[in-house]
Amino acid sequence: FPAVSAGWRISDEPFMQGTKSWLTDLKLRADYGVTGNQGFGSYKSLATMTGFGYYMYNGKSYQVWGPARNENVFLHWEKGKNWNIGLDWALFNGNLYGSFNYYNRTQQDLVGDYPAPMPPYLFSSTFENVGTMRNSGFEFDITWNAVKTKDFSYTLNIVGATMSNKFVHFSKRE
């Protein structure tokens, strides 16, 4: 699955030289990537056979075989398309630092075990790709090294996040 990222250390630019006394670091970063999630065990999409006990015929015992599950040849991996943009910063020789990040993730072809009509299916449920979900939010963290001596240090850290989850699409294949 492909991915790409880039960063720009703004604090190293010539136009930022006048800020070196208080601005230790400033970096803008962004990334985009696609991830895969199989989300189901091997052979869930295939017609497999399983034993259904034994059948006596003419004094002999025969193993009975039949389908183990509903077949779904259209079942495929979930795909997550993710992008982030963030800002990392540090002030006063790194004594106050943090980051801000906005993210957006769209998970397509969600996999789940869903009810199936009988007939035409042999079993009451089947694995299907049925929907799309979008997650987005904002994350931040700020750290302050309040006291830093040879024998003692005291650090304050604040973290926070928001998150929004939304089903964009939910439908079964007809």
Label each region the model flagged.
Residues F1-E174:
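Extracellular/periplasmic, surface-exposed regions of secreted and cell-surface proteins
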